[in-house]
From Swiss-Prot:
GO terms for molecular function: calcium ion binding; patched binding; peptidase activity. The C-terminal domain displays an autoproteolysis activity and a cholesterol transferase activity. Both activities result in the cleavage of the full-length protein and covalent attachment of a cholesterol moiety to the C-terminal of the newly generated N-terminal fragment (N-product). The N-product is the active species in both local and long-range signaling, whereas the C-product has no signaling activity. Cholesterylation is required for N-product targeting to lipid rafts and multimerization. InterPro entries: Hedgehog, Hedgehog_sig/DD-Pept_Zn-bd_sf, Hedgehog_Signaling, Hedgehog_signalling_dom. One of its GO terms (biological process) is cell-cell signaling. This is Indian hedgehog protein. It comes from Devario pathirana (Barred danio).
């Protein structure tokens, strides 16, 4: 993220879910999922952010 968008940081908005905000089968309940966005919350970056996550084997 920092190499692609200088000054933009990765934001983790949720990892573990114990309040039931995700679907019943969500990996958040096992601590094996994470919701992420960028610090500028620019939705136009989300597709590339998803690609970067896949490339990083996340």
């Amino acid at each position: 993220v920092m190499n692609l968008w200088p000054g933009v940081r990765l934001r983790v908005t949720e990892g573990w879910d114990e309040d039931g905000h995700h679907s019943e089968e969500s990996l958040h309940y096992e601590g094996r999922a994470v919701d992420i966005t960028t610090s500028d919350r620019d939705r136009n970056k989300y597709a590339m952010l998803a690609r970067l996550a896949v490339e990083a084997a996340f």
